[in-house]
């Protein structure tokens, strides 16, 4: 679902009406998937955190389906430049009871293949080797029921800084640098208000807002740079014999 998020020409009625085509796409899959059916759905980030109807749809997903795995994909692997995407892996109902339509999700496993990874594209192709660590920890069971343990430190994950977030509260420092972690349905409900935008590693290229100067200091610095640039431009115009034009701009 990579068209515009909002749009018209939605011809069917959903349980949670919305003009967001991406959220309608998710509802369509949840409703039409046969009991016991499996899905792996690529969605943009906003599907994981959008409020209102988005929250309702995620609750429906975790209620009616066993959402067992989320793969956070790196940027640059789709045509839309810079789009951030994820893969949701889920089964309609549960393996024990495919017709179950309540409380189907217990634990959600998340693999972060995005943080501190290159931006992929023609010059840096995304290859099978980049997915190999995820395939290993996912296991052979297609329903996500293979024995799993937290902890996977490929692509220099152990060198990553840990974000100051809910995801890292009461978590071992070494475990917090893993790309592969488990979060309970209850934690998602209480700590994230049913947002599935779950991340815990700190991107080395990100800017720490806490270390930035106060807004008035930033504004003063910006103004000083603008005044200096205008002065240099004024001097250049006069050197070029355009003093009258420079005076007219004052």
PLM feature segments, named:
Residues 1-250:
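A conserved structural/catalytic subdomain of Rossmann-like adenosyl-cofactor enzymes
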């Amino acid at each position: 679902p990579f068209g515009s998020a909002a749009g018209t020409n939605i011809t069917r009625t959903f349980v949670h009406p919305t003009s967001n085509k991406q959220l309608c796409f998710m509802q369509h899959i949840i409703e039409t998937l046969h009991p016991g059916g499996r899905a792996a759905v690529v969605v943009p980030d906003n599907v994981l955190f959008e409020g209102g109807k988005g929250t309702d749809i995620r609750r429906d997903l975790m209620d009616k389906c066993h959402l067992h795995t989320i793969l956070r994909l790196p940027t640059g692997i789709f045509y839309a430049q810079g789009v951030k995407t994820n893969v949701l892996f889920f089964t309609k109902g549960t393996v024990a009871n495919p017709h179950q339509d309540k409380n189907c999700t217990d634990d959600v496993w998340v693999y972060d293949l995005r943080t501190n990874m290159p931006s992929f594209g023609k010059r840096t192709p995304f290859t099978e080797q980049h997915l190999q660590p995820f395939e290993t920890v996912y296991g052979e069971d297609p329903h996500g029921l293979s024995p799993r343990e937290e902890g996977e430190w490929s692509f220099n994950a152990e060198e990553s800084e840990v974000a100051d977030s809910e995801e890292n509260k009461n978590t071992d420092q070494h475990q917090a640098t893993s790309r592969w972690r488990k979060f309970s349905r209850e934690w998602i409900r209480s700590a994230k208000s049913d947002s599935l935008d779950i991340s815990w590693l700190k991107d080395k290229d990100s800017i720490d807002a806490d270390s930035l100067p106060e807004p008035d200091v930033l504004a003063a610095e910006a103004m000083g740079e603008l005044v200096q640039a205008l002065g240099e431009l004024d001097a250049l115009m006069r050197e070029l014999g355009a003093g009258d034009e420079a005076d007219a701009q004052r």
